[in-house]
């Protein structure tokens, strides 16, 4: 018997059985334990969810802004009250250390929901005078029923990042979590209902992206799709969304982000930043700065500082609060990361740290890969060009500022970038030339609710978080009013 039994779909404010008996397993990647059997939604379930969302959205949109704001704020309170319980469930399902999920995943997701709950009454139109007898006013109206499709690395946080602006603007959302990590999103649906969200305004359908995701993105009555995942899949989602009914889309996709360390940087601080940019969440963060550019004259000193810090990583049971490095999200993903590590060795990169699966003792039960650092890397290596999504850092040396900017931009991706320097003018000069949507100076990784995040090039379309994202969940209606007479040419 799985610890959490059978997990059902969440439609119209309640758990309901899927239209078939098909299920998939939720597996703890630290131990291989089957946590739950999760039901697979059918196409008929998708129709039920859409119909439910359409009904609920009308009720939700008819509420006053303050009523909607209060309900979302109650959901924030419940999330914070249940933080530790939800964090442990996230740890079991994803393998991320409890020392991370307890202080980041639910906390930052709740922050985003609170941020948008506060913005609900600020959704306003404009009044535009034309002449003495006429003016135009605009209304920002909700889109209707929207879809969120999540990734497996931050399940509940991503669900909140997508649902918060959608619900704040008066829409309903049908959310499909990753098949790999579905459990906490179902709990979020419970919390929204407990907070007073009308039935149907947040539905959760579990299943594969190939089936459930496609049925949702192609559905003619869905108005917008917000997707987080790989670039290849994102292109397919975007194509199906546009070909079916010209849906609006937001895409948060892959990256191969550069971290540039300048010759005047504090090397200890730069090493700390590089560690967070590569090994936080066991390297499974879309914005990770996996291409670390270091001045050639400083490379040996930087390598020594990185090796010293890697040795301090505490890999282990993610349920132990002392652990700060857990397994990868699945055994399948572990094999993918190990194949990249093998490719790096084959192509001539030098292994500074790690480079293998962890198998001693209890590690053998889980999907653990050692924190890995390659050095003497070149731009044409597979590990430097392709997104690995694991704990693999590549160190590259450079000579001049002009050279490193050119090489940093020589990628199909443009999600994130960072610069370490004590010269603030230099920092801004370099950042302004980097082709990336999310940038940090002397820091890495923080994405507060107020900060719009999203990529350039193949890394995405649109933004999440910040004021601008709220507008993406509305459409503008323009109304001209004539107070005087009307002259016809006929």
From Swiss-Prot:
Keyword hit for Metal-binding: yes
Gene3D superfamilies recorded: Aldehyde Dehydrogenase, Chain A, domain 1, Aldehyde Dehydrogenase, Chain A, domain 2
GO molecular function: betaine-aldehyde dehydrogenase (NAD+) activity; metal ion binding
Residues noted as binding K(+) 1 in the record, renumbered to the chain: 27, 93, 180
Role according to the record: Involved in the biosynthesis of the osmoprotectant glycine betaine. Catalyzes the irreversible oxidation of betaine aldehyde to the corresponding acid.
Complex and partners: Dimer of dimers.
Protein name (record): Betaine aldehyde dehydrogenase
Organism: Pseudomonas entomophila (strain L48)
